[in-house]
Amino acid sequence: MGTSNQPHIVWHEASVSKEERQKRNRLKSCVVWFTGLSGSGKSTLANALDRKLFEEGIHSYVLDGDNIRHGLNAGLGFSEEDRKENIRRIGEVAKLFVDAGVVTSTAFISPFREDRDNVRGILDDGEFIEVYVRCPLETCEKRDPKGLYKKARSGDIPEFTGISSPYEEPVNPELIIDTDQLAVEEAVEKIYAYLHAQESGK
């Protein structure tokens, strides 16, 4: 149940519960929260997992950091305050997807541990699967698919995570994926197996 600081705004319960929606899916809805440096492989893994789930007939969706900034978060910049608001909004959107019975993958750098923990806090136990997409900065910088590291090194992008702004590594993530060691297919199978193990209570 949500809360509001406006006393005249009340929460309306849905006629179809989250549990009823989950029973129609083959996997319990949750947020698979991919976090890591730019270029670590978050979006690649999120979309590969989404494809795997789709092919298995499981309702799923990807919330991608770049895509969200084209719409919902178009007005936000990259200051610490705006980054926090970016993640707060995504957490709320992801929660709605979970309530709809959808396995939701999110691909955001989400550099601050507190922000990730806040998202975990608004979800039920077991619904936030933190996946640390771990990759050495040197490797991410070599990949640099968007040319962002080059711009950050030259000073064109201020407060760039890993260069001029910190990335706070997860302390106890549900999964760690080393993308400089695992192929995409191997990583997806590892995540997929984890989700099914959670479903069966193993």
From Swiss-Prot:
An example Gene Ontology molecular-function term: adenylylsulfate kinase activity
Active-site residue numbers: 110
Pathway connected to this protein: Sulfur metabolism; hydrogen sulfide biosynthesis; sulfite from sulfate: step 2/3
Highest taxon of the lineage: Bacteria
Residues that hold ATP according to the record: 36-43
Gene3D superfamilies: P-loop containing nucleotide triphosphate hydrolases
Keyword Transferase: yes
Entry annotated with the keyword Transferase: yes
Keywords associated with the record: ATP-binding, Kinase, Nucleotide-binding, Phosphoprotein, Transferase
Catalytic activity: adenosine 5'-phosphosulfate + ATP = 3'-phosphoadenylyl sulfate + ADP + H(+)
Known function: Catalyzes the synthesis of activated sulfate.
Protein name: Probable adenylyl-sulfate kinase
Species for this entry: Halalkalibacterium halodurans (strain ATCC BAA-125 / DSM 18197 / FERM 7344 / JCM 9153 / C-125)
Taxonomic lineage from the root: Bacteria, Bacillati, Bacillota, Bacilli, Bacillales
